């Protein structure tokens, strides 16, 4: 019989059907090739939004800069970046009036954090622009290179290990007449391969010293490298994102720490919380507006969209905000916080790799690096690119473009949220002084606006006033892309609200399945995802049970570990059948060893090894949990591991899962091809750095919280700690006299070697 699909929904409240509208199957689009074009778009657009501003020239770098602040008031609905300083300051003052003490308290909290933060805070984060090599590197390597070069140029405040002292070095480095750096270069030679007798290109990497004069150094210190944002769904065009260098990062971190403290205290802010906490916070605002709208009042909600949020924000405005927020604070603190916006007012955008040309007829390819765009003949380019290059040329210096206005993506999310909330805050009746009033939610550039008024005209007037107020601080609400509805139905940061936030389970679909780390981690992650969705996303018991069965099936196909008694033939089945036959307690075999699945929705929180431990044969236990098993290169095992899960929409989320170490927790070996490239030295540095840090963490297990202070080097700290620990262990009888003597001898040897060095 045919089933009429609409019957399925008869008993379902409409909001629960949202999961059936899931549009994102398949892989998201990734970018290939160069991001130069996208970066030029960003630079040109940003200048266009501020074109009526004043042009000046930076005296140090010679870069032309456009300042739109206090520019003309808008006369049309086009997006613009002409924020008015006095309006921003007034919005801040009203925000403080509504939340007495909010700035003062946040400053005190931040001051404490500033004095305690260690420089290794900057090792967090992925790709970072490394100014010494003029390209991207992992954050830890970029920091190590920066510190190494600072020290060789006589900047040593950073040796205390405090971030604030490293920032002192950054400030001093900008005053130096020149900086000497070590940079890598490649030599390419064509040689004949002995084995294949073909000609191959051999690369060797060399290091050379180079002197940067003040101007060149400043340009590098103020540079943001750009890349193309990957995996963005629902867009036809890619866009550029920026990664700043180590000089900027520390200052940005402190500004964002202050802004985060403020956001935490603002009920309209969707940052820095997430998940259920965020939903609860936001539901409160909606509830307030709905209860306060008396029976006679109308209440409407705008699902808002801002045009080019980042490109219309201005670092000079952020400087004004910080100056106001910190106005009663000590001078040193105000200075530290004002440096980030000042650097951003003078920032340079690196144009990336440049363009690749190829001639089909002659089978030739050639790269035109960004540095050449300033003076290359434009006849080689198509019309569109020609226009871009012509427009950007006056701004170019050494392959970077001067970009004073605009903020680049994702740099000051917290601080720009504070600005947005300050406008929402002005919607209180005591400020609007009329019959309409508004409130709302703000999370970086995303907002929802709730307007209450006695009639439709009032609602319209309220929206208009909000729109115009935003314009005064450089926020451009897009009338085309914003959508108004009766309060009770709206969307905010991919949360859909209909009489409460609706669980949109389909958004989590991409994270179901086998991750492909190893058999042990994949099993654990798979069941944890299902468990988390039962807790957070209304995944019901029947659906969860089905998801679990599908996951186990998927897992068995991925690792070819069908049950020992199944008829499916794979290249592992011979071994698994043998194991199955010689195992007494078959229920104890892990799924990855051809065992049965004992998971159901009640025991998803228990790691599989623990679930089956009592059921295992003794010799199987011994093989499974054997740290000396020669076939497994083991990770250090923590009780909890972290993985990244990708929802369909929005940022990748970090997720914890239980990690029980078994011989299935293998790590694939690193691909060899990297070892033959210029990256090799960097890889070795990074591994050495990693090893040292791991060793250090072993000696000071809580070292992520309290590091030893005032001891001159890591090695000495570890040696002295080893001696203390050994003495305690010896006196309490945990180690024998011989072992104690051996430890002491090793410690002395290490110290001796250090002295000789």
UniProtKB/Swiss-Prot annotation:
One GO CC term, this protein: host cell nucleus
InterPro entries per the UniProt record, alphabetical: RNA-dir_pol_NSvirus, RNA_pol_PB1_influenza
Motif (Nuclear localization signal): 187-195, 203-216
Annotated catalysed reactions: RNA(n) + a ribonucleoside 5'-triphosphate = RNA(n+1) + diphosphate
Localisation: Host nucleus; Host cytoplasm
Keyword Nucleotidyltransferase carried by entry: yes
Alphabetized GO MF terms: nucleotide binding; RNA binding; RNA-directed RNA polymerase activity
PROSITE patterns xrefs: RDRP_SSRNA_NEG_SEG
Region (Disordered): 52-82
Biased composition (Polar residues): 55-64
Gene3D superfamilies: 6.10.140.720
UniProt-listed GO biological process terms: DNA-templated transcription; symbiont-mediated suppression of host gene expression; symbiont-mediated suppression of host mRNA transcription via inhibition of RNA polymerase II activity; viral RNA genome replication; viral transcription
Keywords (A to Z) from UniProt: Eukaryotic host gene expression shutoff by virus, Eukaryotic host transcription shutoff by virus, Host cytoplasm, Host gene expression shutoff by virus, Host nucleus, Host-virus interaction, Inhibition of host RNA polymerase II by virus, Nucleotide-binding, Nucleotidyltransferase, Phosphoprotein, RNA-directed RNA polymerase, Transferase, Viral RNA replication, Viral transcription
Region (Promoter-binding site): 249-256
Domain RdRp catalytic: 286-483
Post-translational modification: Phosphorylated by host PRKCA.
Keyword Nucleotide-binding applies: yes
Disulfide bonds: none
Major enzyme class: transferase
Entry-linked Pfam families: Flu_PB1
Family: Belongs to the influenza viruses polymerase PB1 family.
Role: RNA-dependent RNA polymerase which is responsible for replication and transcription of virus RNA segments. The transcription of viral mRNAs occurs by a unique mechanism called cap-snatching. 5' methylated caps of cellular mRNAs are cleaved after 10-13 nucleotides by PA. In turn, these short capped RNAs are used as primers by PB1 for transcription of viral mRNAs. During virus replication, PB1 initiates RNA synthesis and copy vRNA into complementary RNA (cRNA) which in turn serves as a template for the production of more vRNAs.
Assembly, per entry: Influenza RNA polymerase is composed of three subunits: PB1, PB2 and PA. Interacts (via N-terminus) with PA (via C-terminus). Interacts (via C-terminus) with PB2 (via N-terminus); this interaction is essential for transcription initiation.
Protein's UniProt name: RNA-directed RNA polymerase catalytic subunit
Gene source species: Influenza A virus (strain A/Chicken/Shantou/4231/2003 H5N1 genotype V)
Taxonomic lineage from the root: Viruses, Riboviria, Orthornavirae, Negarnaviricota, Polyploviricotina
């Amino acid at each position: 019989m045919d089933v009429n699909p609409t019957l399925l929904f008869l008993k379902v409240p409409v909001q629960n059907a949202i999961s059936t509208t899931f549009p994102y199957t398949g892989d998201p689009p990734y970018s290939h090739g160069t991001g130069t074009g996208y970066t030029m778009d960003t630079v040109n657009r940003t200048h266009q939004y501020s074109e009526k501003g004043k042009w000046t020239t930076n005296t140090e770098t010679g870069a032309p800069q456009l300042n739109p602040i206090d520019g003309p008031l808008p006369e049309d609905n086009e997006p613009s970046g002409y924020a008015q300083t006095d309006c921003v300051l007034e919005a801040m003052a009203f925000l403080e009036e509504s939340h007495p003490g909010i700035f003062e308290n946040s400053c005190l909290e931040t001051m404490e954090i500033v004095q305690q933060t260690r420089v290794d805070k900057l090792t967090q984060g992925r790709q970072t622009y490394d100014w010494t090599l003029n390209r991207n590197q992992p954050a830890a390597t970029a920091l190590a290179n920066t510190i190494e070069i600072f020290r060789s140029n006589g900047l040593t405040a950073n040796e205390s290990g405090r971030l604030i002292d490293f920032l002192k070095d950054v400030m001093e480095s900008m005053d130096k007449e020149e900086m000497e750096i070590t940079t890598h270069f490649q030599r390419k030679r064509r040689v004949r391969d002995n084995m294949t007798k073909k000609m191959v290109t051999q690369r060797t990497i060399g290091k050379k010293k180079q002197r940067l004069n003040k101007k060149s150094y400043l340009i590098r210190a103020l540079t943001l490298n750009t890349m193309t944002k990957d995996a963005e769904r629902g867009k036809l065009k890619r866009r550029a994102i920026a990664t700043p260098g180590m000089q900027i990062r520390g200052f940005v971190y402190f500004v964002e720490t202050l802004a985060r403290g403020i956001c935490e205290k603002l009920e309209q802010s969707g940052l820095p919380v997430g998940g259920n906490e965020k939903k609860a916070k936001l539901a409160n605002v909606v509830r307030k507006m709905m209860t306060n709208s008396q029976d006679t009042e109308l209440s409407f909600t705008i699902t808002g969209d801002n045009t080019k949020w980042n490109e219309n924000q201005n670092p000079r405005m952020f400087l004004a905000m910080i100056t106001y927020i910190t106005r009663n604070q000590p001078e040193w603190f105000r200075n530290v916080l004002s440096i980030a916006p000042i650097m951003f007012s003078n920032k340079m955008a690196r144009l990336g790799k440049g363009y690749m040309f190829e001639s089909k007829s002659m089978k030739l390819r050639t790269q035109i690096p960004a540095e050449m765009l300033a003076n290359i003949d434009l006849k080689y380019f198509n019309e569109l690119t020609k226009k871009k290059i012509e427009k950007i040329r006056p701004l170019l210096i050494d392959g970077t473009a001067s970009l004073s206005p605009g903020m680049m993506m994702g740099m000051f999310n917290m601080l720009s949220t504070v600005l947005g909330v300050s406008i929402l805050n002005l919607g209180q009746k005591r400020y609007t002084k009329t019959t309409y009033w508004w409130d709302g939610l703000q999370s970086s550039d995303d907002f929802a606006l709730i307007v209450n008024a006695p009639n439709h005209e009032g609602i319209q007037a309220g929206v208009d006033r909000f729109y115009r107020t935003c314009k005064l601080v450089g926020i451009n609400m897009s009338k085309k892309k914003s959508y108004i509805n009766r309060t009770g139905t709206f969307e905010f940061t991919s949360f859909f609200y209909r009489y409460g936030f609706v669980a949109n389970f389909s958004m989590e679909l991409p994270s179901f399945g086998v991750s492909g780390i190893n058999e042990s981690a994949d099993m654990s992650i798979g069941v944890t995802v299902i468990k988390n969705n039962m807790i957070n996303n209304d995944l019901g018991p029947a659906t969860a049970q089905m998801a679990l069965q599908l996951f186990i099936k998927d897992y068995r196909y991925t690792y070819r570990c069908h049950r020992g008694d199944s008829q499916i033939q794979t290249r592992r089945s011979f071994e698994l059948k043998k194991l199955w036959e010689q195992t007494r307690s078959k229920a104890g075999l892990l799924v990855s060893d051809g065992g049965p699945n004992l998971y159901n929705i009640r025991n998803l929180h228990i790691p599989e090894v623990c679930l089956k431990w009592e059921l295992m044969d003794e010799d199987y236990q011994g093989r499974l949990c054997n740290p000396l098993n020669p076939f497994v290169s083991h990770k250090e095992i923590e009780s909890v591991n972290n993985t990244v899960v990708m929802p369909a929409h929005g940022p990748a989320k970090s997720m914890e899962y239980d990690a029980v170490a078994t011989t299935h927790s293998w790590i694939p070996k690193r691909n060899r091809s990297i070892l033959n490239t210029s990256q090799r030295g960097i890889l070795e540095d990074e591994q050495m750095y990693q090893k040292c840090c791991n060793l250090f963490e072993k000696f000071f297990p809580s070292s992520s919280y309290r590091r030893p202070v005032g001891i001159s080097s890591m090695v000495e700290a570890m040696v002295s700690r080893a001696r203390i620990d050994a003495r305690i262990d010896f006196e309490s009888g945990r180690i024998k006299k011989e072992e104690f003597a051996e430890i002491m001898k090793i410690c002395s040897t290490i110290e001796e070697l250090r002295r000789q060095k």
